[in-house]
Every structure is written in structure tokens, then in C-alpha cells.
Swiss-Prot record:
Cited InterPro entries: QueC, Rossmann-like_a/b/a_fold
Its biological purpose: Catalyzes the ATP-dependent conversion of 7-carboxy-7-deazaguanine (CDG) to 7-cyano-7-deazaguanine (preQ(0)).
GO terms for MF: ATP binding; ligase activity, forming carbon-nitrogen bonds; zinc ion binding
Gene: queC2
Protein name: 7-cyano-7-deazaguanine synthase 2
Length: 219
């Protein structure tokens, strides 16, 4: 059985990717990160799912890097997480500079250590506009760099790179997944806000698939 590291935030995109990898027969190792995000509640969801799936899971504490990213509303207490759709200009404040390169680099190192052949992460087409490190050109060069950075080549793959959240949910429905086991909201409060870009995109995906979102919202 081929080993695979899946970067798993606890959100619906990486939740679907994680389950996809398990169902495809990979020996999956999940890796989550506490990088100082306001919505670190997602890590509880990630741990619970991995326990249910019997998937080895590490949560890496790298909160100290948040001091480098004071311009991001996801980690800075001085900036409010904006409401609205990802297409709005104010959503750029949710960018954590170089986040995916940092997280993927750590995942590659982990993959080399456990002799895994690849790293998956949950980038999708809905992220392309706002997040440069979710675009096809980034995935391509990160994959190339990974294969020359170590003696052991590790590939980097985003299984939903050319699919939006609507399509991801559609695939998850086919797999029979329970999305009450995911946390999407950037606010990290008791209930999902329903108004941040992440919530808006999630709600649109459920509406497009004609099913109810099992998560409770404060709106």
C-alpha cells in the first residue's frame, strides 16, 4: 500500500481529499497545522475525523510564525475577517503570505521521513482568484521543486485543483460523506458566521447541490 501525506485542515475541501485518498487505497498520514489561525477550532474536527478513520494524525504547532504575518486577517487580532464573496477585493486580507509553500514544505519533509510517495492538499479552482498558492502554476513548480529538493522524490498534488467547491461537495456526496464533521468558518466561534468568504462559498456549494448544510450558522 502506497503511503501518502494529506495536509488536512479540518475544512470541507481537505476533508473530501482525505476521504478520497483513503477510499482510493492509500496508506494515509494526515498532517494539520496550528499556525495561529483564528479558526483553529478546525483542528478539533480534523482530529475527530482521523480518529474515526483510524488515520495517523499529527498537529504541528507553528503558531509563532503568525508574528510574521500581521497583514493577514486570519491571524492578526488587529484586522477583522471580512464578510462577502471571495471575488471581492477585501478578501485579499485573508491571504497568509506564502502559507501553502510553508505547509507543503513541512509536509514534504514528513513524507520523506516516513517514505511516503506524495503530498496532497485541498486547493481548488475557487481559490485561484485570491490565493496564488492554490493556482495550477504554483502546484506545478512546487511539485518540481519537491522532486529535486531531496534524494527521495515526493510528488505534490491537489486532487481538486480544477474543481470548485460545488464539484468537491458533489464528489463528497457520492462518497457518502458527512459534512457536519467539518469546520469552514474563518471566525472560529461557537457557530459558523455564514457571512465570511469561506462560509459564503460553502453555502453556495450546498445550495447548488440542492442539499441542506448540516452545520449551524449564527445568521
Amino acid at each position: 500500500m502506497k503511503k501518502l501525506v494529506v495536509i488536512y485542515s479540518g475544512g470541507m475541501d481537505s476533508f473530501t481529499a482525505l476521504n478520497k485518498a483513503v477510499k482510493e487505497g492509500f496508506d494515509v498520514y494526515a498532517l494539520s497545522f496550528d499556525y495561529g489561525q483564528k479558526h483553529n477550532k478546525e483542528l478539533i474536527y480534523a482530529q475527530n475525523v482521523c480518529n474515526e478513520l483510524n488515520v495517523p494524525h499529527k498537529i504541528l504547532d507553528i503558531k509563532s510564525i503568525s508574528t510574521l504575518f500581521t497583514s493577514s486577517s486570519l491571524v492578526s487580532d488587529d484586522i477583522n475577517v471580512p464578510d462577502g464573496h471571495y471575488e471581492a477585493d477585501n478578501m485579499k486580507s485573508t491571504v497568509v503570505p506564502n502559507r501553502n509553500m510553508i505547509l507543503i514544505s513541512l509536509a514534504i519533509g514528513y513524507a520523506v521521513d516516513i517514505e511516503a510517495e506524495g503530498v496532497w492538499y485541498g486547493a481548488h479552482s475557487g481559490d485561484h482568484l485570491i490565493y496564488p498558492d492554490c493556482r495550477p502554476e504554483f502546484v506545478k513548480v512546487m511539485d518540481q521543486a519537491s522532486k529535486v529538493a531531496n534524494f527521495e522524490p515526493v510528488y505534490v498534488h491537489a486532487p481538486y485543483l480544477n474543481t470548485d467547491k460545488i464539484g468537491i461537495l458533489k464528489d463528497g456526496i457520492k462518497m457518502g460523506l458527512d459534512y457536519s464533521k467539518t469546520w469552514t468558518c474563518y471566525q472560529g466561534k461557537e457557530k459558523a458566521c455564514g457571512t465570511c468568504g469561506s462560509c459564503v462559498e460553502r453555502l453556495e456549494a450546498f445550495q447548488a447541490n440542492n442539499i441542506d448544510d448540516p452545520v449551524q450558522y449564527s445568521i
